[in-house]
Amino acid sequence: MLHDPELHYLDNAATTIVAPEVAEVIDKAMREHWANPSSLYAPGARSEEALNAARAAVARTLGCKSKELYFTSCGSEGNNLALLGTAQTRTFGKGIVVSGFEHPSVQRPLERLAAQGYNVTVVKPQADGTLDINKMLDAVDKNTILVACMMVNNEIGTRNDVERLAAEVKRRNSRTIVHVDAVQAWMRVPIKLDNIDTMTVSGHKIHAPKGIGALYLSDRLVQAFQPPYLGGEQERGLRPGTENLPYALGLAAAATRLAGSIKSRDKAVRALNDRLRAGLSVFPEVEINSPAGAVPEVLNFSENCIKSETMLAWLSEKQIYVSSASACGRGQPSHTLAAMGRDPLAIDTAIRVSFCADNTPEDVDAFLERFEDGMKHLQRIKK
């Protein structure tokens, strides 16, 4: 998608470049579906029909009913809606169990609930970056109203077995709500909603624009759902505000575009990840933070020499674009690496490279070349 051969974008976990065909769908929708979908006249009816079609298309990729799919502005909004909108509907207990490396949009709503008297149990990841599902299950009891666990970690790429987690949670307490943040997983790994009650996805991680996402909310929870904010009856009254129809159509186009190619894209991206791992293996200082079973789209490592911000600035000057941690935690050290027990030097020198299927071996080679130059040059300056 990039036309500049000297520019190498390797930060796809932060955001992806909008696909040209998705941009075309949005542009067309802005011109043709300008009416409010709630309006009763003919243009409004056509907009409503288009919105329903977009909803159905996105729902198909998740394997849910159209009426269980709600458009949001992003994954963060979806997480807030899911957590704050369901927790207070459960009156049989105050227990909440959550993994220790969730996105801030999961952490902070749960911190608010903790301040309101809920008992939040945080299960830290293991030293290798994996999550012990059994430890989460051990924390579930008759008073547990909610369990939250991301499917793929946004910083190190850990893939969590949320299907097993959800099934086992329901066996222990069928009334417990299971929430899954699938923002980094959607269109990267297969998704099954069995035993999962709420799930969030986001458009800008799959080559749709920023500003559009979706929340899956099991139909059995709708009647008791308490939306955090109130307004009109859009999205069945659960997410008020005039719908962003052009972006909803763009989300549907992006999801449909990728839905049939998960396996082939996984193979292509895995080859890039392997190439990068092999290239990094020649640096004795480098320590890989991503666990062996991580999704291939994300490779996090610490170079244990140069502060991340310094190395990122060097690479950016060479048009190599990567990151040090989650874009949503800008300027903050990685809470994921801290939860894993990494030492301060490893945290301060961490770099995240994240791929999409549009990346090439040349992107990897360019990164490795500029990274090697940076290690030599910046260490000389440091001395």
What feature does the model see in each segment?
Residues 1-383:
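Pyridoxal 5′-phosphate
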